[in-house]
Amino acid sequence: MIKILNKSFKPRLKARIRQNRRVLNKNLDNFFEWVKGAELIELQECNVEEDPVRPELSNEFRTGYGRKIFGVKYRGEIHAVMCFAYTNEIPRTVDELEKMSHDAYLQSTLRDQNIGRIAIAYTVWSKKKGGGMLIVKEVFKKI
């Protein structure tokens, strides 16, 4: 009895595994397809409630002196966001980040319009898999 079940079961199992493998490969291709059509844009504001790292920071802070917000847009929807600041030193706290980015901005207005030497990404988040890595690569290509 077991031999009969074993003989009929093995081919069906192998066929099902092959079919599942095809479906899985197709789904993986579709999973990252959105990355190819995404574009990097500079944002004037973002939904701070979605920020898992620093939701306490306002949009005014994020777009203040020497600070910018970038997003990855795909089909009219933002899928990843990155906030960063230009500074001349590496800050240890958010207060230091604010002071250093403001200072770097003021120095740039008096000099040659080069805002800070260091770009600090102080918050990055993504709604889709692969979005965080994509936005980091694209923003640092741009700056």
Regions of interest found by a model, annotated:
Residues 2-64, 69-71:
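Short amphipathic alpha-helix that is part of the acyltransferase structural core
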Residues 35, 72, 139-143:
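Hydrophobic, Leu/Ile/Phe/Ala-enriched alpha-helical segments that form helix-helix packing faces
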Residues 53-54, 105-106, 136:
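Amphipathic coiled-coil/heptad-repeat helices and related helical stalk/stem segments
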Residues 59-80, 85-94:
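A short helix-loop-beta-strand connector motif used in the catalytic cores of GNAT acetyltransferases and
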Residues 62-65, 113-116, 143:
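Flexible, charged surface loops at secondary-structure boundaries
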Residues 86-119:
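Conserved acyl-donor/pantetheine-binding loop and adjacent beta-alpha core of acyl/acetyltransferases
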Residues 126-143:
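Conserved acetyl-CoA-binding loop-helix of GNAT-fold acetyltransferases
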